[in-house]
């Protein structure tokens, strides 16, 4: 794709030179029973790939399966981690990963959204993270309305994402990436899973975003009616649905034709990059002829190398030498079939690649240097962008978690019903435990242990499934800089705090009414507080288990050994003096000891039978001593603090593991 001086001036030109990407490959030894002896070698995915993209271009990356389309897309966009070499520059300026994420967006092949949100709520929520911190709420709402109009989702604005069609979800994902009004759009298989019409609509939307030229705002009420558009105000600001469109010239017919093609031509009115065209590059698999014609340029890949890169209409000329395209044949299908077919001793891909390398030798001569000052000014403008503060990120994420819970209220009520059924079952089993006798000492200890276990297991296993399921969203949004990983983690933990206290006291209410009613209201308050702390500590334990594995199945299966070890050290199945140090690693121990201490420490008299052959504990202090629990005055608060410390340790380890995984894997 040669560039002249006119193209370079006033344009943003992204160039990639000699990109090479290797991944480790393992070969299993045939002579080892355990397959422990493995030879490490590197498998090349990209080989000396060079090219460029300028604003106004819509490029399609074509190639067979395994040709390296998605890898090239990720490498150019700086979303790829691993052994990547080569240069990516913007008008001659080297681009780092954080700089690239500020000026570009990446549309994944498969949509990743909070399915319980509506289309409007999803965009409005993301606008808080992706727009400048000083943007007002009214401006955010205006931007969201414009985006919904731009991608043709105005009528589905208040429909839940899980109820949208495949094409609508794809366009919503595109709108979400357009919130920042990026200059460069990287789209990985944007037509996957869509019917021909939906796929055409998505690519057509991208085409208009890339080729638009801004015009003055117009009132469209005469064409579409007052209900559809608002007239811009005198000060130049737009109304609720005023738009700007692409036109080819200043003729009246061009404007009317552009209007007829709504809603796929709408763009943000208050775009900070409004005077600058966009550029999009898409990996795409077998596009139809109509879709293929929408692309301004194509890149053909074979075996991790470029076979052809240039304007779409010039590709046919490139392939005419030695290859005959059948009549009425989709050009994209012909090019891909040519690459796949063998031609004599060499395959067609090798022949075409050699021809392309000969024709483009010395093509990339640095014409982007003409616009280097322009890109420098643009990057200064981008770097002045200020995200919302960390504490506000936490607040918004807590709201999102709670909104998800409210949207799934039915499943939440079912789970809560089973939880309370367990409480009723335990209350019936221990309903005969009332007076304080030698026979009831063990019953009370067992019921307290069951309270502790139920809270810990319920919350730990409830959290175990969260991170494996949320990893795709975390990887995308954290890698894109939407919010920090620490904000997400803290918000997740905080969202469980009110749930822990609510469930803790509700569960205890059923048990307390049938067993401990003679002890008064203060005991109810303190026991509920301890159960809630146990639940909070269990959240840390569950997140720890979840962070060790990438799948919820592995996390649940491997949790059993941890549960067994910590449970044995809890003080019921084994005297804690038998494990003087190991008990301090068990949250079951702290929870059980605190509950037992809180119940028994004020008991001064326990009846002893006259002919009882077993040891008789006459006070609550003796009950605690028999179980080898601590009896100091500070035991209650020490155990409370210990539960929080255990939770903190689990969270620190979990956060470290998750951050390491995110940094290692990146966007993919």
From Swiss-Prot:
The lineage of its organism: Eukaryota, Metazoa, Ecdysozoa, Arthropoda, Hexapoda. It comes from the Eukaryota. Residues 1-412, 475-490, 546-561, 659-668 are cytoplasmic. The chain crosses the membrane at residues 413-433, 454-474, 491-511, 525-545, 562-582, 638-658. It is found in: Membrane. It is a multi-pass membrane protein. InterPro entries: AAA+_ATPase, ABC2_TM, ABC_transporter-like_ATP-bd, ABC_transporter-like_CS, ABCG_transporters, P-loop_NTPase, Pigment_permease/Abcg. Its EC number is 7.6.2.-, 7.6.2.6. It catalyses: guanine(out) + ATP + H2O = guanine(in) + ADP + phosphate + H(+); riboflavin(in) + ATP + H2O = riboflavin(out) + ADP + phosphate + H(+); (6S)-5,6,7,8-tetrahydrofolate(out) + ATP + H2O = (6S)-5,6,7,8-tetrahydrofolate(in) + ADP + phosphate + H(+). It holds the Pfam family ABC_tran. This is Protein brown. May form a heterodimer with w/white. ATP-dependent transporter of the ATP-binding cassette (ABC) family which transports various molecules including bioamines, neurotransmitters and metabolic intermediates. In the eye and probably in association with w/white, required for the transport of the eye red pigment precursor, guanine, into pigment cell granules. In Malpighian tubules, involved in guanine uptake. Probably in association with w/white, involved in aging-induced intestinal stem cell proliferation in the midgut by regulating tetrahydrofolate transport. Residues 434-453, 512-524, 583-637 are extracellular.
């Amino acid at each position: 794709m040669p560039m002249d001086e006119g193209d370079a001036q006033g344009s943003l030109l992204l160039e990639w030179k000699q990109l090479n990407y290797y991944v480790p490959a393992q070969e299993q030894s045939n002579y080892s029973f355990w397959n422990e002896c493995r030879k490490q070698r590197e498998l090349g995915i990209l080989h000396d790939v060079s090219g460029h993209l300028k604003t106004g271009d819509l490029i399609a990356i074509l190639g067979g399966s395994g040709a390296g389309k998605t890898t090239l897309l990720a490498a150019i966009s700086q979303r790829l981690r691993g052994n990547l070499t080569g240069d990516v520059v913007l008008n001659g300026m080297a681009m780092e990963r954080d700089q690239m994420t500020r000026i570009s967006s990446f549309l994944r092949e498969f949509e990743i959204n909070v399915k319980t949100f509506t289309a409007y709520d999803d965009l409005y929520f993301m606008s808080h993270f992706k727009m400048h911190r000083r943007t007002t709420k009214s401006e955010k709402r205006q931007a969201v309305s414009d985006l919904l109009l731009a991608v043709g989702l105005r009528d589905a604005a208040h429909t839940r994402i899980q109820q949208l069609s495949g094409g609508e979800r794809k366009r919503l994902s595109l709108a979400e990436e357009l919130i920042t009004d990026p200059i460069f759009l990287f789209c990985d298989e944007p037509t996957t899973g869509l019917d021909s019409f939906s796929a055409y609509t998505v690519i057509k939307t991208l085409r208009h975003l890339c080729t638009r030229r801004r015009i003055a705002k117009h009132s469209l009420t005469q064409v579409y009616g007052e209900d559809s558009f608002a007239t811009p105000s005198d000060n130049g600001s737009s109304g609720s649905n005023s738009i700007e469109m692409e036109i080819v010239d200043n003729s009246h017919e061009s404007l009317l034709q552009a209007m007829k093609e709504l809603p796929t031509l709408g763009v943000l009115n208050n775009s900070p990059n409004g005077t600058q065209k966009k550029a999009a590059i898409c990996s795409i698999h077998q596009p139809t002829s109509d879709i293929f014609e929408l692309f301004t340029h194509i890149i053909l890949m074979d075996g991790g190398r470029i076979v052809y890169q240039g304007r779409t209409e010039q590709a046919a000329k490139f392939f005419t030498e030695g290859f005959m395209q059948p009549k009425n044949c989709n050009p994209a299908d012909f090019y891909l079939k040519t690459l796949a077919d063998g031609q004599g001793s060499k395959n067609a891909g090798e022949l075409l690649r050699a021809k392309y390398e000969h024709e483009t030798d010395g093509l990339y001569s640095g014409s982007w240097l003409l616009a280097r000052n322009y890109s420098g000014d643009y990057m200064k403008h981008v770097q002045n962008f200020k995200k919302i503060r960390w504490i506000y990120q936490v607040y918004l994420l807590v709201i999102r978690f709670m909104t998800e819970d409210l949207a799934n209220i039915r499943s939440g009520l079912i789970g809560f019903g089973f939880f309370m059924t367990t409480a009723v079952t335990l209350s019936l089993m221990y309903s005969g435990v009332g007076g304080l006798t030698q026979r009831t000492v063990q019953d009370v200890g067992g019921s307290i242990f069951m309270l502790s276990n139920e809270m810990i297991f319920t919350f730990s296993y409830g959290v175990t499934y969260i991170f494996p399921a949320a990893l795709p969203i975390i990887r995308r949004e954290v890698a894109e800089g939407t919010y920090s990983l620490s904000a997400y983690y803290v918000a997740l933990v905080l969202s469980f705090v009110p749930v822990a206290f609510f469930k803790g006291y509700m569960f205890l209410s059923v048990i307390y009414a049938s067993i401990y009613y003679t002890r008064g209201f203060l005991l109810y308050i303190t026991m509920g507080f301890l159960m809630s702390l146990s639940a909070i500590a269990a959240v840390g334990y569950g997140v720890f288990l979840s962070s060790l594995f990438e799948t919820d199945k592995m996390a649940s299966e491997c949790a059993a050994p941890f549960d067994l070890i910590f449970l044995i050290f809890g003080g019921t199945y084994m005297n804690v003096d038998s494990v003087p140090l190991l008990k301090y690693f068990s949250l079951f121990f702290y929870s059980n000891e605190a509950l037992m201490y809180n119940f028994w420490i004020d008991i001064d008299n326990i009846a002893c039978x006259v002919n009882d052959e077993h040891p008789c504990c006459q006070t609550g202090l003796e009950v605690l001593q028999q179980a080898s629990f601590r009896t100091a005055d500070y035991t209650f608060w020490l155990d409370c603090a210990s539960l929080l410390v255990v939770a903190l340790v689990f969270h620190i380890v979990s956060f470290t593991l998750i951050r390491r995984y995110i940094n290692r894997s990146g966007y993919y």
